[in-house]
């Protein structure tokens, strides 16, 4: 899938400027103008904040270094961070989702499964990175846990960012170049090390963004976009780094989108006896039959059932 950004909304007059949202903190947004000028802080018009990092926007200058967002361009997709009480959009116009795992500490398969469902539901290419392959005592165990995901067709890239940084950089760039990629990872997996490997001035950029957004010392509490260096053929791409893996929710997804977000379910869905089968306890359910005979892992079906339950608790 192409990593090219969607077409930006047209700026109708000289007082309006097009740009890309590169960071967000509350109702504060940092926008990089299309003309290559200095980034400036922007605010949405009105009380509601419907802007996400990765959005193409049009803003009106309110002062030399501030603007008001007046238009949001057409989106390829939109990802949410959600809990039982609310959903908040946080990233837009992606085409890939990268999950950073490690041989140690022990990674959560529940969180991995949720990330893969989010990728499938938003038509993003999922990419699993297994870091710390130098920890040989834990390597085979981690590989064994990831084997079912490889069997589903998911790409797993093995790296040792700390011990073999250049090899890791080459392996990662091959998959990231030309794509807009959301980066997710639990604490301790090496996500920050990965960002610093690929974006040498990431820490400096983070401090500058934090200052521009008036977020002070809370440098890890905002979503931000880092442009990737251009390759020889001129294709760069972007990394979108967002904190709070555990908060990454799926409550806004309908049951229909959830069932199709499990690739092993999709070929079996037409075989259910009832067209509105929930795949939980219905007779003649092709999914439950596949779980019973081992074609679908019980853990994957349990995740589906849990996500259906969580979605049912939301007042829509």
Swiss-Prot record:
The keyword DNA damage does not apply. GO terms for molecular function: GTP binding; GTPase activity; metal ion binding; rRNA binding. Its EC number is 3.6.1.-. GTP binds at residues 131-134, 185-193. Keywords: Cytoplasm, GTP-binding, Hydrolase, Metal-binding, Nucleotide-binding, Ribosome biogenesis, RNA-binding, rRNA-binding, Zinc. Zn(2+) binds at residues 272, 277, 279, 285. It is found in: Cytoplasm. Its main location: cytoplasm. It holds the Pfam family RsgA_GTPase. GO terms for biological process: ribosomal small subunit biogenesis. It is an enzyme of class 3 (hydrolase). Binds 1 zinc ion per subunit. Gene3D superfamilies: Nucleic acid-binding proteins (2.40.50.140), P-loop containing nucleotide triphosphate hydrolases (3.40.50.300), Probable gtpase engc, domain 3 (1.10.40.50). CDD domains: S1_YloQ_GTPase, YjeQ_EngC. Residues 83-248 form the CP-type G domain. Its cofactor is Zn(2+). GO terms for cellular component: cytoplasm. It comes from the Bacteria. One of several proteins that assist in the late maturation steps of the functional core of the 30S ribosomal subunit. Helps release RbfA from mature subunits. May play a role in the assembly of ribosomal proteins into the subunit. Circularly permuted GTPase that catalyzes slow GTP hydrolysis, GTPase activity is stimulated by the 30S ribosomal subunit. Belongs to the TRAFAC class YlqF/YawG GTPase family. RsgA subfamily. Monomer. Associates with 30S ribosomal subunit, binds 16S rRNA. This is Small ribosomal subunit biogenesis GTPase RsgA. It comes from Paraburkholderia phytofirmans (strain DSM 17436 / LMG 22146 / PsJN) (Burkholderia phytofirmans).
């Amino acid at each position: 899938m192409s990593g090219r950004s969607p077409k930006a909304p047209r700026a109708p007059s000289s007082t309006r400027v097009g740009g890309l949202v590169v960071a967000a903190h509350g109702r504060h947004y940092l926008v990089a103008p299309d003309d290559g000028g200095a980034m400036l802080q922007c605010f949405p018009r009105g009380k509601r904040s419907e802007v996400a990092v990765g959005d193409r926007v049009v803003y009106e200058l309110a002062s030399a270094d501030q603007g008001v967002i007046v238009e949001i361009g057409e989106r390829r997709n939109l990802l949410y961070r959600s809990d039982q009480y609310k959903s908040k959009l946080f990233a837009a116009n992606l085409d890939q989702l990268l999950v950073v795992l490690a041989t140690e500490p022990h990674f959560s398969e529940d969180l991995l499964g949720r990330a893969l469902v989010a990728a499938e539901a938003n038509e993003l290419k999922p990419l699993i990175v297994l870091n710390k392959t130098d920890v040989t005592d834990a390597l085979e165990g981690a590989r064994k846990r990831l084997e079912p995901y490889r069997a589903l067709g998911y790409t797993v890239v093995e790296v040792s960012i700390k011990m073999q940084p250049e090899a890791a950089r080459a392996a990662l760039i091959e998959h990231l170049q030309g794509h807009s990629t959301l980066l997710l990872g639990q604490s301790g997996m090496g996500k920050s090390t990965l960002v610093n490997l690929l974006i040498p001035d990431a820490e400096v950029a983070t401090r500058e963004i934090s200052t521009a957004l008036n977020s002070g010392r809370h440098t890890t509490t905002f979503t931000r976009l880092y442009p990737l260096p251009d390759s020889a053929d001129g294709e760069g791409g972007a990394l979108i780094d967002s904190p709070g893996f555990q908060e990454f929710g799926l409550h806004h997804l309908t049951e229909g989108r959830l069932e199709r977000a499990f690739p092993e379910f999709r070929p079996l869905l037409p075989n259910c006896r009832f067209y509105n089968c929930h795949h939980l306890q219905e007779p003649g359910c092709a999914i439950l039959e596949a779980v019973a005979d081992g074609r679908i892992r019980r853990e994957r079906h349990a995740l589906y059932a849990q996500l259906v339950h969580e979605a049912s608790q939301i007042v829509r």
